[in-house]
C-alpha cells in the first residue's frame, strides 16, 4: 500500500506540475530526482512524509486513496480524482498535437510558394534592384575626360587666355572638375581666311614690306 501511495503521489505531482489548474507544487523535478517523474514506468520516487507535520485524519486519507496531489507541505494536501487527471492529460495531448500541426503547416506554406503572385514579384523586383546597385558600386573605376577650350581676346592687355576644363568621373554619382589656365602674348594682327592666328609680338614679312614701302614714299616726297 505504501508503495502504491508513493507511485500515485509521483504521478499526481507530475499532473499538478504540467497543468497547474488545481494546485501549486512546492517541489521541482530536480528536488524529486531529475526527469525521472516524466515517465510513469520509471521506478517510484521516494518521498518522505513527516507524520508529525500531518494530522491523523490526513494520514488515514493517504492510506486509503490512490489519487493524491502533494502541494506545499506541510500546510495542506489536495486530492484529485484519477479520471479527471486522465481527461486533463488527453486534452493536453490534443492541444499539443494541434499546435505542432499548425506550426508545421505554417512553415510549409511559407517555404513552398505560400506567397501571393504579386508578393513574389515584388520580392523578385527588390532583389534585382539591390543586385543592380551592388553591381554599380562594385564596378571598376573609370574616367571620362572632356576638354573645352575657351579663347577670350582682351584688346586692353593683348592677352590670349585659354582655359582647359577636365571633367573626371571617378565612380557613379561622384565627379571632380579641374581647371588649367594659360596665357600668351597676343598681337592685334591676324590673317583672315587662314587657319592660323598671329600669336606673337614680332613683325611679320608683310609688316616689314609695308614699312619699307612707306619709307620709300616718304623719302621721295621729301626730296
UniProtKB/Swiss-Prot annotation:
<comment type="function">
    <text>Involved in sporulation. Essential for completion of the nuclear division.</text>
</comment>
<keyword id="KW-0325">Glycoprotein</keyword>
<keyword id="KW-0336">GPI-anchor</keyword>
<keyword id="KW-0449">Lipoprotein</keyword>
<keyword id="KW-0732">Signal</keyword>
<keyword id="KW-0749">Sporulation</keyword>
<dbReference type="GO" id="GO:0051321">
    <property type="term" value="P:meiotic cell cycle"/>
</dbReference>
<dbReference type="GO" id="GO:0005576">
    <property type="term" value="C:extracellular region"/>
</dbReference>
<feature type="signal peptide">
    <location>
        <begin position="1"/>
        <end position="20"/>
    </location>
</feature>
<dbReference type="GO" id="GO:0009277">
    <property type="term" value="C:fungal-type cell wall"/>
</dbReference>
<keyword id="KW-0469">Meiosis</keyword>
<keyword id="KW-0134">Cell wall</keyword>
<protein>
    <recommendedName>
        <fullName>Sporulation-specific protein 19</fullName>
    </recommendedName>
</protein>
<feature type="propeptide" description="Removed in mature form">
    <location>
        <begin position="199"/>
        <end position="223"/>
    </location>
</feature>
<dbReference type="GO" id="GO:0098552">
    <property type="term" value="C:side of membrane"/>
</dbReference>
<dbReference type="GO" id="GO:0070583">
    <property type="term" value="P:spore membrane bending pathway"/>
</dbReference>
<dbReference type="GO" id="GO:0005628">
    <property type="term" value="C:prospore membrane"/>
</dbReference>
<feature type="lipid moiety-binding region" description="GPI-anchor amidated asparagine">
    <location>
        <position position="198"/>
    </location>
</feature>
<keyword id="KW-0964">Secreted</keyword>
<keyword id="KW-0472">Membrane</keyword>
Amino acid at each position: 500500500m505504501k508503495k502504491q501511495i508513493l507511485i500515485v503521489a509521483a504521478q499526481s505531482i507530475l499532473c499538478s506540475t504540467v497543468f497547474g489548474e488545481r494546485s501549486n507544487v512546492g517541489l521541482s523535478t530536480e528536488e524529486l530526482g531529475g526527469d525521472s517523474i516524466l515517465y510513469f514506468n520509471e521506478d517510484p520516487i521516494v518521498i518522505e512524509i513527516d507524520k508529525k507535520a500531518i494530522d491523523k485524519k490526513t494520514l488515514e486519507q493517504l492510506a486509503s486513496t490512490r489519487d493524491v496531489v502533494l502541494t506545499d507541505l506541510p500546510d495542506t494536501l489536495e486530492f484529485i480524482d484519477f479520471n479527471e487527471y486522465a481527461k486533463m492529460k488527453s486534452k493536453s495531448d490534443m492541444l499539443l498535437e494541434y499546435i505542432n500541426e499548425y506550426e508545421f503547416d505554417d512553415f510549409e506554406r511559407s517555404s513552398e510558394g505560400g506567397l501571393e503572385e504579386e508578393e513574389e514579384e515584388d520580392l523578385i523586383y527588390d532583389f534585382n534592384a539591390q543586385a543592380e546597385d551592388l553591381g554599380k558600386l562594385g564596378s571598376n573605376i573609370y574616367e571620362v575626360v572632356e576638354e573645352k577650350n575657351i579663347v577670350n581676346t582682351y584688346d586692353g592687355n593683348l592677352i590670349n587666355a585659354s582655359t582647359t576644363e577636365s571633367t573626371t568621373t571617378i565612380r557613379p554619382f561622384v565627379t571632380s572638375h579641374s581647371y588649367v589656365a594659360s596665357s600668351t602674348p597676343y598681337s592685334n594682327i591676324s590673317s583672315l581666311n587662314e587657319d592660323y592666328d598671329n600669336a606673337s609680338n614680332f613683325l611679320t614679312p608683310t609688316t616689314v614690306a609695308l614699312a619699307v614701302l612707306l619709307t620709300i614714299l616718304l623719302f621721295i616726297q621729301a626730296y
